[in-house]
A protein has these predicted regions:
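Domain-level detector for long C-terminal conserved domains
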Residues: 1-437
Length: 437
């Protein structure tokens, strides 16, 4: 729900260069959750010819829209150091608890983003005009809730533990054995070579995926909560409803290259996020030495955090930050990029609108949105590419489930008039590629 299960893609590589599409491109992304494809494509722009791109984004919930905006904004924040921005991004994306510095940034930045929704502060790359007024109101509530919940604390680790107890039932007391089984018998054979058992087990127990020697996570991450509704002077929200079996290790931490150096999934993710932020800022290739200095091989066989912080720290209230200065707009300039969010309800409507017929050069679809294929195909240009996320890294699915998904997807694609670019199956691939006839 809060992250994807496939590596970030440079979407320019998926578009066949043609004269009529070389200066302006339209891309539709459905259900990606974490803006990784936009970030990767932005970072790789210096490798391609100059081109303006409009990204049209559809997410199932407004909380996912808000997280996408926050994660994009963090990567584009020119006031942050390179490693600082990288770790803020990874912690906010995948940890139930944040380091104090990250939590302070989240509280301050949430206030800034709430002001961008109301257009008190201008955000040049963000376009919310397609959202309904109630959606924009909800988006503003979410950012305000994050700012307040980060200061006041929410019991997210307790929410996490309740989910684990409900899921495992009588096996809860033997949960480490369950986690080890899922790791060794399911995830490891599927090919994630850098995810260590210590990282995976610690995340399954507590929801903390990415850890470093410098600083311990102690403040709750409210961006992982959903169904946020204002009530009087406060807010109502659901407890944690996201993924508790797979983890945020299958996007930036996926490493397809064979390396002699053994690294944790955290190290790979940090390197790849640092790479894209560096390339967005400098439009130059990334130097590996920028990230290698702090690594210690001894951490491979252990975890950096040995015990969870006291819940009193998680709930400790902070004072409210002063209003963000209006003239302080922190984003890097990306003049050739616009990011346009649409409400989920438009998926059923766009195919009937003339201006969207054969509009998009490339469409990317999450694994849980494939039922929408019949609504999406009319939006794709002739010879355009459609990319569909597969379910390789969903540990709750067995071999027969993956085979069934592959078979059903191929059948649906054929009925919709799509042609496979490369043969695929869900056991060995993370993306299926199709082309319109």
């Amino acid at each position: 729900m809060w992250w994807g299960y496939s590596a970030p893609l440079d979407l320019r590589c998926e578009i066949e260069e043609k004269e009529e599409t070389s200066k302006s491109l339209e891309v539709l992304i459905i259900g990606a959750s974490d803006a990784r494809h936009i970030i990767k494509t932005l970072a790789s722009s210096y490798k391609h010819s100059d081109c303006s791109i409009i990204y049209h984004i559809i997410e199932p919930t407004m909380e996912q829209v808000a997280r996408s905006i926050l994660l994009l904004s963090t990567c584009l924040d020119k006031d942050l150091g390179l490693q600082e921005a990288t770790r803020y991004y990874l912690e906010i994306m995948g940890n139930t608890l944040l380091r104090p510095a990250t939590a302070k940034y989240l509280a301050k930045h949430s206030k800034l983003l709430a002001d961008t929704v109301t257009q008190t502060i201008d955000c040049p790359w963000l376009n919310l005009e397609k959202l309904k007024h109630k959606d924009r109101d909800q988006l503003e509530w979410i950012f305000k809730f994050w700012e307040r919940a980060t200061r006041e604390g929410v019991p997210i680790v307790d929410y996490w533990d309740r989910r684990i107890r409900k899921s495992l039932k009588t096996r809860y007391d033997y949960r480490d054995g369950v986690f080890d089984w899922d790791y060794h018998m399911i995830l490891k054979p599927r090919g994630h070579s850098n995810l260590t058992i210590h990282e995976y087990r610690f995340w399954r127990n507590n929801g903390i995926a990415f850890t470093w020697i410098e600083g311990e996570p102690a403040r709750s991450n409210p961006t992982l909560l959903n169904n946020i509704i204002p009530l009087g002077d406060g807010f109502l929200h659901y407890a944690y409803l996201g993924d508790i079996t797979n983890g945020p290790f299958f996007t930036w931490a996926l490493n397809e290259e064979k390396e002699n150096v053994k690294l944790r999934a955290t190290d790979i993710a940090e390197r790849e996020v640092m790479r894209v932020i560096h390339e967005i800022r400098t439009k130059e290739p990334f130097c590996e030495e920028l990230v290698a200095a702090h690594r210690d091989p001894s951490i491979l066989n252990g975890i950096i955090i040995t015990e969870m912080p006291s819940s009193e720290i998680e709930y400790e209230s902070w004072t409210k930050y002063n209003k963000y200065e209006k003239q302080s707009v922190p984003w890097i300039s990306i003049p050739s990029t616009k990011i346009l969010f649409h409400p989920l309800s438009t998926l059923d409507l766009l195919k009937n609108k003339a201006e969207y017929k054969e509009k998009f050069d490339t469409i990317w679809i999450a694994h849980n949105m494939t039922k929408q294929l019949p609504n999406i195909i009319p939006l794709l240009k002739k010879k355009g590419h459609i990319l569909i996320e597969l379910r390789k890294y969903l540990s709750e699915l067995r071999k027969e489930d993956l085979e069934s998904f592959t078979k059903e997807l191929k059948s649906t694609a054929q009925v919709c008039g799509l042609r496979e670019i490369k043969s695929f199956n869900s056991e060995t691939h993370t993306i299926a590629q199709f082309c319109s006839n």
